[in-house]
Each structure stands twice: as C-alpha cells, then as structure tokens.
C-alpha cells in the first residue's frame, strides 16, 4: 500500500492587547497513521490527532481532531479548513493566538 501524508498549510496570528502583533505561515506534513498525535506550530497546548484512516479503493478518508472539533479529510476532495485558538493573560495583558489550518491528504 502506498504511504500517504496529511498536509497542513497554516497561518498564525498573535495579538497582545493590540500593542504587539505577529504573523507567520508555513506547511507541515505528517504521516497519515491512525492514533498519531502531533503538536501544532506556535500553539503547543493544542494537538492534532488522527483518529481514523479508512481506505476504499483509491479513496483515503482521514478523521482528524483539532481543538475540540472533528474533521474528515479525503485525498480527492477540497482542502478542509480548521481553526485553533488560545487566549490567556500575561502580566495583566490579554493575549490571543489563532491558527487557521487547511488540510489535504497526498501520496508520499
């Protein structure tokens, strides 16, 4: 069986009381392995979990879990968009982080 990867293109935003703002973007590739768990870029408190991987002929379905939400990603479908958020206080300042992710499945 061919190996497949879960590809995640991501955009990150960080805002501290509207006084300091930062952005970043990138792409990660993860082995499409049922039960695997990966740390997200920038927001390390939230992980990406691959709950199940099913093959039906040439079609690959992956069920993933990110920040309290479950998504299904297929190798012949459109990108699946997911979001992760983390808000907290630092020395009395409110900090907001967000990660917009677009997932696809591709052959290795």
Map each language-model feature to its residues.
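Surface-exposed, beta-sheet-biased, low-hydrophobicity segments with strongly acidic/polar composition
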Residues: 1-108
């Amino acid at each position: 069986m061919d190996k497949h990867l879960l590809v995640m293109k991501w955009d990150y935003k960080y805002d501290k009381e509207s006084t300091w703002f930062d952005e970043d973007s990138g792409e990660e590739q993860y082995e499409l392995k049922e039960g695997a768990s990966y740390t997200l870029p920038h927001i390390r408190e939230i992980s990406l979990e691959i709950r199940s991987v099913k093959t039906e002929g040439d079609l690959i379905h992956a069920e993933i879990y990110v920040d309290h939400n479950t998504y299904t990603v297929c190798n012949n479908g459109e990108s699946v968009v997911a979001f992760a958020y983390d808000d907290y206080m630092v020395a009395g300042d409110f900090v907001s982080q967000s990660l917009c992710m677009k997932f696809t499945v591709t052959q290795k």
